[in-house]
């Protein structure tokens, strides 16, 4: 529906088996992949093997087996794979990159990174297909790939070893009991507790939700409004990760999906001082026509703490649009390359950056399951640097 409004005509659909023939007939040069995460490798490899370049959303894929398949197919075909890490393009995050590149805090020895998903955006992952790792790889892959890529990019390095601990502590039946929701349904539409549940999700709230999901349930059987307190899911909502990087930097990272505000706090500790950056994002729910990841200026800042000198704030670059203003800049970079000059920040990401970002999360998944540190080379060896 939205594509029709934006493009001015009805988008053409086809069966997956007909995709390559239709692309060939239409003289298409690239395939844009935005399927459920677990299918990314199928379409990426299909396109590469048939001579097409690929633009894919994050995460590039969800496990090391699928990652290897993409890397091997890319190497064999020589075609291009671009991963759309829009967070790199947000002016404030580019500003952090620029500051670090100046050496303002010296060599970076450690990083503390804490990401919060609020009770709207965070809860939404537990309603949808993301709630099963077989579809999404869990939040360590689906969501944190953004965050791990930012650190790889900010520090110009890659991960070597990962140790993680995680659990589902909030989105479970016990929490429904805590809130007095004793007669809940497995979906919101017919739930007897809808009037007193703060997590009630109304599929009739907007035309886009109704048209895209509710009216299509009879065709695909997909329920967009599953109960966030169901026991029928296997992803975590509370995760802590320790990462050792190739350049010697250490990072402590956390992701919590049930916090009262949305955004992150990151601190870089260097030989000459400390850089702190906080970012608050607006409330967002997929499909409700709101802007995803728009910044709240009053809650976004950068501060420098030089060794033995007074701390000071850095004026933030203004931005508009989704993902901190990164979406419009990235879209221009992809679809209007003739307008771009050389990017000294190297924000465009290929299959190598896509692989390094997901492998931190994939290693974290293995570590949470086995309770041991995981080396990246044990998952995918001889991976090229970006």
Stretch-by-stretch model annotation:
Residues 37, 41, 62, 66-71, ...:
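Catalytic cores of eukaryotic secretory-pathway lumenal/extracellular enzymes that build
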Residues 12, 29, 160:
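Conserved acidic residues
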Residues 209-255:
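Alpha/beta-hydrolase fold catalytic core
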Residues 12-18:
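Short acidic-hydrophobic, aromatic-tinged amphipathic segments that line or gate anion-handling sites
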Residues 25-30, 36-37, 41-88, 103:
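Beta-strand-loop-alpha-helix segment that lines the small-molecule cofactor/substrate pocket
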Residues 235-386:
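C-terminal helical cap and adjacent loop that interface with cofactors, partners, or active-site loops
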Residues 1-10, 21, 334:
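N-terminal Rossmann-like dinucleotide-binding module
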Residues 87-226, 334, 371:
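Predominantly a Rossmann-like dinucleotide-binding segment in NAD(P)-dependent oxidoreductases
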């Amino acid at each position: 529906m939205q594509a029709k409004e934006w493009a001015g005509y009805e988008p053409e659909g086809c069966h997956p088996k007909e995709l390559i023939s239709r692309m060939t007939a239409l003289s298409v040069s690239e395939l844009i992949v935005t399927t459920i995460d677990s299918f990314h490798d199928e379409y990426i490899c299909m396109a590469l093997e048939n001579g097409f370049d690929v633009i894919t959303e994050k995460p590039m894929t969800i496990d090391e087996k699928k990652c290897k398949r993409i890397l091997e197919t890319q190497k064999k075909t020589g075609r291009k794979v671009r991963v759309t890490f829009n967070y790199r393009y947000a002016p404030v995050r580019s500003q952090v990159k620029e500051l670090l590149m100046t050496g303002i805090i010296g060599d970076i020895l450690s990083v503390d990174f804490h990401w919060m998903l609020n009770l709207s955006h965070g809860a939404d992952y537990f309603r949808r297909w993301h709630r099963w790792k077989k579809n999404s790889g869990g939040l360590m892959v689906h969501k944190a790939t953004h965050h791990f890529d930012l650190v790889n990019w900010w520090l110009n390095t890659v991960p070597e070893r990962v140790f993680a601990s995680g659990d589902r502590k909030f989105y479970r039946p016990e929490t429904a009991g805590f809130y007095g929701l004793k007669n809940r349904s497995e979906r919101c539409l017919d739930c007897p507790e809808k009037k007193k549940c703060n997590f009630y999700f109304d599929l009739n709230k907007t035309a886009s939700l109704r048209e895209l999901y509710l009216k299509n349930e009879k065709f695909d059987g997909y329920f967009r409004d599953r109960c966030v307190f169901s026991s029928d899911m296997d992803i975590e909502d509370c995760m802590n990760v320790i990462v050792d990087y190739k350049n010697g930097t250490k990072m402590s990272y956390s992701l919590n999906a049930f916090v009262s505000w949305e955004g992150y706090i990151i601190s870089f500790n260097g030989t000459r001082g400390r850089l702190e950056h906080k970012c608050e994002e607006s409330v967002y729910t997929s499909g409700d026509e709101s802007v995803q990841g728009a910044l709240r200026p009053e809650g976004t800042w950068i501060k420098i703490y030089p060794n033995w000198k007074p701390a000071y704030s850095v004026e933030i670059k203004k931005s508009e649009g989704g993902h901190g203003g990164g979406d419009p800049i990235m879209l221009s970079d992809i679809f209007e390359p003739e307008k771009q000059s050389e990017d000294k920040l190297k924000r465009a990401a290929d299959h190598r950056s896509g692989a390094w970002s997901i492998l931190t999360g994939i290693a974290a998944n293995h570590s949470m399951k086995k309770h041991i540190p995981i080396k990246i080379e044990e998952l995918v060896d001889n991976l090229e640097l970006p």
